[in-house]
């Protein structure tokens, strides 16, 4: 069975986006870390997150969860992204398309909520400066059943790894 990890950047107030983009300037090393962790993996996201990507995520299989009607689950677009309407189809295609044992949930807020019970690890880039946006997650709720398993401090941000408590005992 494939393991789901969430990867996201957020501020102390839970802000993760504004106008379908990150509300902060690029953080040194953050995109490289995202690429390193997700390269060769399946990434699961919502339609708005997919549409906000500035470029195709090369070397990764994208599964896009959407509320828009689909003729069949698993329809692919010109970039090869797989479109699905529900969690079970997302997980089925993640399992089928995966070349490893981990898939990453990359957003947005609604997708994190829908897959929360299945996520075993969270890779959080904590942005130290406060930003306002239009998309938020409840960080306290998100990590309440997790235990910090790693931390890497930087000037403008800190990387945290959280592992589901039942898996660390």
From Swiss-Prot:
Molecular function per GO: dihydrofolate reductase activity; NADP binding
Catalytic reaction equation(s): (6S)-5,6,7,8-tetrahydrofolate + NADP(+) = 7,8-dihydrofolate + NADPH + H(+)
Gene Ontology biological-process annotations: dihydrofolate metabolic process; folic acid metabolic process; one-carbon metabolic process; response to antibiotic; response to methotrexate; tetrahydrofolate biosynthetic process
Pathway of action: Cofactor biosynthesis; tetrahydrofolate biosynthesis; 5,6,7,8-tetrahydrofolate from 7,8-dihydrofolate: step 1/1
Keywords associated with the record: Antibiotic resistance, Methotrexate resistance, NADP, One-carbon metabolism, Oxidoreductase, Plasmid, Trimethoprim resistance
Family classification: Belongs to the dihydrofolate reductase family.
PANTHER family, alphabetized: DIHYDROFOLATE REDUCTASE
Protein name: Dihydrofolate reductase type 8
Organism: Escherichia coli
Lineage: Bacteria, Pseudomonadati, Pseudomonadota, Gammaproteobacteria, Enterobacterales
